[in-house]
Amino acid sequence: MNNPLEAVTQAVNSLVTALKLPDESAKANEVLGEMSFPQFSRLLPYRDYNQESGLFMNDTTMGFMLEAIPINGANESIVEALDHMLRTKLPRGIPLCIHLMSSQLVGDRIEYGLREFSWSGEQAERFNAITRAYYMKAAATQFPLPEGMNLPLTLRHYRVFISYCSPSKKKSRADILEMENLVKIIRASLQGASITTQTVDAQAFIDIVGEMINHNPDSLYPKRRQLDPYSDLNYQCVEDSFDLKVRADYLTLGLRENGRNSTARILNFHLARNPEIAFLWNMADNYSNLLNPELSISCPFILTLTLVVEDQVKTHSEANLKYMDLEKKSKTSYAKWFPSVEKEAKEWGELRQRLGSGQSSVVSYFLNITAFCKDNNETALEVEQDILNSFRKNGFELISPRFNHMRNFLTCLPFMAGKGLFKQLKEAGVVQRAESFNVANLMPLVADNPLTPAGLLAPTYRNQLAFIDIFFRGMNNTNYNMAVCGTSGAGKTGLIQPLIRSVLDSGGFAVVFDMGDGYKSLCENMGGVYLDGETLRFNPFANITDIDQSAERVRDQLSVMASPNGNLDEVHEGLLLQAVRASWLAKENRARIDDVVDFLKNASDSEQYAESPTIRSRLDEMIVLLDQYTANGTYGQYFNSDEPSLRDDAKMVVLELGGLEDRPSLLVAVMFSLIIYIENRMYRTPRNLKKLNVIDEGWRLLDFKNHKVGEFIEKGYRTARRHTGAYITITQNIVDFDSDKASSAARAAWGNSSYKIILKQSAKEFAKYNQLYPDQFLPLQRDMIGKFGAAKDQWFSSFLLQVENHSSWHRLFVDPLSRAMYSSDGPDFEFVQQKRKEGLSIHEAVWQLAWKKSGPEMASLEAWLEEHEKYRSVA
């Protein structure tokens, strides 16, 4: 057995030895403390936001950020205003950044925008899910198109931001006041260029920059970020799962959201040299060409222009030295070897004069586009070619910054240029120089307008998610009326039917004048009343409640019925007005045209006009002309009914008037009776209720020579607005509306419609129209309209929308369920009717028709829903 004392001695010696050894744990902690882990948020200068001043307090700078409403187009006056801002308002030597962001996060906007075009009934949830999936899938990928048509048509939302910061370490009160004044000056200058702005606060800032930095290619919904007032802004802009890897030719960005990993590839391209020519109004064609839609950038991107206005004295001195050197060389043998030296000397001489007089300034600028796509080589190659080709079409040569993608990516973020990044760009030789007017033409400020927050989803030609709501009050429209013209197959009916459905779903009513059964299917599917013109029965006095308000309208109706060609004069109309009032006062709603004729007969035989042969002659003429509408007259059965065909409880009424076309006198009488009925119903219903009257084939229904018809239409179209009423008039050709050949009624409808939609036109007729009226359309508009295709061939309708002075180009895509609902094809109509007879509801019948006509598409939408819908509620 060992000695216990030896064991104790050994233990003590071990402890002493251990105490003499160096402290390895302390050394490890020291090494860990010295290690610097790479963290992207540390590169960002964002720190705090001053609520009182609206300024951002960064690490070494102080600045502001504005969101601007993109302008739909531009002209020379806007460019001159921007040039003036650069020359006279912007501090020298400090970067200003303009960011145009094409966002894929449109999920919320789609859902909100479709709320008035949603399905109702027992199948509403299932139907709305399919319709929503149709547009969501288009935003994630692109709209389905026929084989061979490879156009990048998707859904995006464009936003413009302007950021500026200047060095300020102490953030003194003087610096803050100076920056506040600069914000006011910049905003006023932009307003002078028709660019409306609003300031970006801290919450909006972390949402915007968070979207710029944390791109998830699988997400369609913006992430809800909660502002933490106790944390620096730079940490709140970067996701915890953010994983950025730098490659030679691109960056990869990894994120983890809702239990799923995503990886995006970030590509950058910057301007290689000054373009030979550039116009502000054409800048949007760089990312989406109107005439060549295949030259479009469909992936999300950020187009950034970073500019610095150089010191005027230094640039003027530089121009002087350059001019004197070149002017001297141009007078020596040097010019024989380099003939261009004379031209250069002249250009520098002109530049120094402009700089000396303050007419121009020299601006250094860097134009870069940052694109986001899925992380695979095939997709990245397509994106690269789309970007390079789109810009090259307009004379912009872009290059990829090999080994410098991180640098270029940082330039698309606010306030980064002011931290010293622009200096690095200059040292790298990628900054261009140009005069202020030329740089103003490069500003990424032009993009399409989303129009209204909700309505008919009709994306623009540049893929901007847009909605059309004719009852929206923010479009500077003076009324809610719409004029539509397009040849057969252009998609007129498919465009109007969703508008009708939205009015009905909102609780309003719609009346359609049709010639050709185009709305019969929709009427049946919506539970409306379908009436043939031959069965219509009227009474001009049936719906009158106030004779003082309605007497003149009834008089006008009877005047046109008596003389469709407008041969009655003021005396005729005065006598007729007396007859109308007397008939109403005697029998009220039971009055008939017979009572009007009886009054005229009694007046003709009375002693009052015994000595007035001219008046008696007029009375006799009206008696003869109105006799055909009395109870025993040719058309008496149409206008003397005790029970008129039209009842106020019908939400939708379609009137097929094709059978009356060969009887123009009867047709005009019926038209007037219908319009008066609709007017009276508008007046008698609450003003918050939407009312719609669609006049299809207006070129046939409004082709009357009587000027009274035009006045009648004009008055009705003008007064409808006060009662939330709208008239939609549809013709085959713009000549039917806006030409010397158009009837007064058609011209009145065109002139009193704030909304004008022009679809595909007959090529021959449209060319002839442009020769006769060369100022009606701009050359670009003629070329665009000339390229419109047939709706069935390209699976969408193309149209020009004009709202007062605003013009925009749109496409209308319709989901398979809506296509089935609106289809007027004979076999489709019979299919639905047969299913209804079998006991199916209208929605079940439409569902089966959609699967019958578009089975693969319906299957793909259901599969998409199954994969993505579970993440929708989380988002």
Curated annotation (Swiss-Prot):
Keyword line: Cell inner membrane, Cell membrane, Conjugation, Membrane, Plasmid
GO CC terms: plasma membrane
Location in the cell: Cell inner membrane
Bilayer topology term: Peripheral membrane protein
Pfam families linked: DUF5934, P-loop_TraG, TraC_F_IV
SUPFAM superfamilies named in the record: P-loop containing nucleoside triphosphate hydrolases (SSF52540)
UniProt xrefs under Gene3D superfamilies: 1.10.8.730, P-loop containing nucleotide triphosphate hydrolases (3.40.50.300)
InterPro entries on file: F-pilin_assembly_TraC, P-loop_NTPase, P-loop_TraG, TraC-F-type, TraC/Conjuga_ATPase, TRAC_dom
NCBIfam families per UniProt: PRK13721.1 (NF010278), TraC-F-type (TIGR02746)
Free-text function comment from the UniProt entry: Required for the assembly of mature F-pilin subunits into extended F pili.
PANTHER family named among the record's database cross-references: CONJUGATIVE TRANSFER: ASSEMBLY, PTHR38467
Designated name of the protein: Protein TraC
Organism: Escherichia coli (strain K12)
Lineage start: Bacteria, Pseudomonadati, Pseudomonadota, Gammaproteobacteria, Enterobacterales
